Amino acid sequence: MKLKRISAFLLAVATAFTVAGCTGDTTSSENKNESTDNSSVTSSVTSDVNSGDNNNTGSQTLFEFGQVAMGGGGFVSGVFATKEEGLYYARTDVGGAYRFDKSLDRWVSVSYDISEEDRGLLGIEALAFAENEPNKLYLLAGTEYFSNGKSCLLISDDYGKTFTRTELTDLIKVHGNGMGRGNGERIALDPKNSDIIYIGGRTGGMIKSTDGGKTFTALDMGTKTETANSNGICSIVIDSASGDIYAAISRKNEDNLYKSSDGGNSWTAVAGAPKDMMIQRMKWSNGKLLIVYASEEGPWNNDRVKGGIQIYDPAANTFTDISPAKKGFGDVVVHPEDANKMVACTENLYVPQPNGAYGDEFYVTTDGGKSWKLLNNVMTMSDGGIPWINSSSIHWCSSMCIDPNAPDKIKVVSGNGIFACDNIWSDKPEFYFNSKGIEETVPYELVSIVDGPLVSVIGDYDGFCQPDATTFGNVHNSIAGSMTSIAVARKNPDVWVKCGGDESNPGFWYTEDAGKTWVNVKVSPLESKKRAYKGAVAVSADGKTFYWAPENGMGFIYYTTDKGMSWTKSEGGMATSFISADPVNPDYVYATSSGNFYMSSDGGKTFKPNRELSVFTATRPIVTPDTEGRIYYAAMGLQISDDHGETFNRVDSVSSCLSVGIGKGKDENSPYVIYIWGKPKGEEELGLYWSEDEGKTWSRINDELHQFGGPGNGGFVHGDFNTYGRVYMSTVGMGIVYGDVKQ
């Protein structure tokens, strides 16, 4: 076996576009390429790729990486305008950070190069930039439950094209996907010296750097900063005139706003500040401090009837209530040339919006908050070229920005992406979805149908059906929340099944018309008759038998031959994580658990384990669309079976395989390509590799700049059955990434 590494020289010369990422001291390239409005943006990497023959003659191959075009799909926790025309930044809770590229009129990820080991750094807790040098970008990154809770400050001086890293784990705790993640910002730069940086932690209090973030020391605020809601210090702002620092602590019924006039060496509680609400955000305007309040830290637990907006005048030491209503608010922005003109948004309110969905309210004032106009009954909403959003609302509005160069323009975050309005002061403001380039879904499964579309299931928003990776599709019309599994009958490809749901919603659906209509099965397979939900599904090759291993069914497999009118429990097969049906013979079904590989030869009535195969972690059994009995399985390396799983042969060339997928081959001599997330023998780096000769030789198709945090929650790698050289991979919060081979 011959393995050829990526040539650093070729990469430097031939990488046409760069990806910005968050690894320490690495040069990355921007996720940027010319693209039509309805397609995803790609970035490129050049590799020496083995041709697959025994002579190991290589050919130069260009791989282009992008994200499958869904559009938004997750909570964007902060959005920011800069003084540079057309330059915006955004942060997300699980999908990294983005920069708006005005030349492409879309968002560009700056987080492609996060490794699987460091995938927690895709949770961005806070974002800051130097006011007069917006190329200097700072990201506070970390996720409590990933990467051993690693907390880091990621520092860039080139708009996020490259980053250096300062680890903060021993000083403070960061959790980009924690409650209160829409609060902010927890980073503040001294307006007169951007090398002086203050950061507030969920635990650990406040820390300060005087060398641009290279080193930090802890500050004593004279009060306990750890809070019952684990949100800690949630906002820091600095008065550019006086240099005074204000910090908010996420608590109520006690002092929660503190001030320092000596660079953080000493702190005092601000007298007269409201104590019965929690501070969400703070910002300076015209020498006064605007403070936004809600009953809890958010984004979804506020009681919706308590909150407001206060103006603090430090000269008079007075607070003035300018709330549009007694409701929880997320943010307020001020016209840069007229401090009397402001826009405010609620957070976690659910009232009618123009498209019929329920979400937050928007208000404007032109008299400094003496009176406010509600916009919900006069504004309009449009999809911005991403059609699935038409049935969704603008909600969880915890951050807004106003363009200092074009103050008619605002952007606001939502639980599903970013919305924008370019005429906010008009009588009929026009809001539109502004999320092209942002891909923040959490994918759980994807199926490439031969001569058909891509179908997927994701967290929160059901899933998508789309003609290809670069065209925005529509969500399944069942719109049933989080889905965990989907399968297609390979010989009857109009029949699909999927599962999701929860304790209150039946969790199995099927379609017999390729997703045009879905039927929700009401009958539970569980003996207790409790609602079954989530788990794994499969459908026989002929589409006549459905299989389901519900998450709350102890991993037992159930099958139905009457479309869910009745269910029968299979014998054998326990703690099941994945099910696959043979693509040709409807009698054969395969299942896996963390301890066993199971096969059935009687249509799922009984399953027996393969006692010869050691399985420690359950992965998907992968089948080809037209070959009976052939199974690819990631276990103790890469295993292949040609007899329905009775026996497996280990591929000697692979030392580690965490996920495996199959895709369309180049020609009849190589009908299928194998893709893995793993390590062939002789390779040191975990990554995406492919083989065109059934595993005899392998070549890496990604590099350190294209890691995407690894396969994430979905844990899948799949090839496309219609496009040669296209591979898909799930992520923890960057949607589904894909790579295309270009000769």
Please tell me what each predicted stretch does.
Residues 2-5, 9, 20-34, 47-743:
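Extracellular glycan-interacting surfaces
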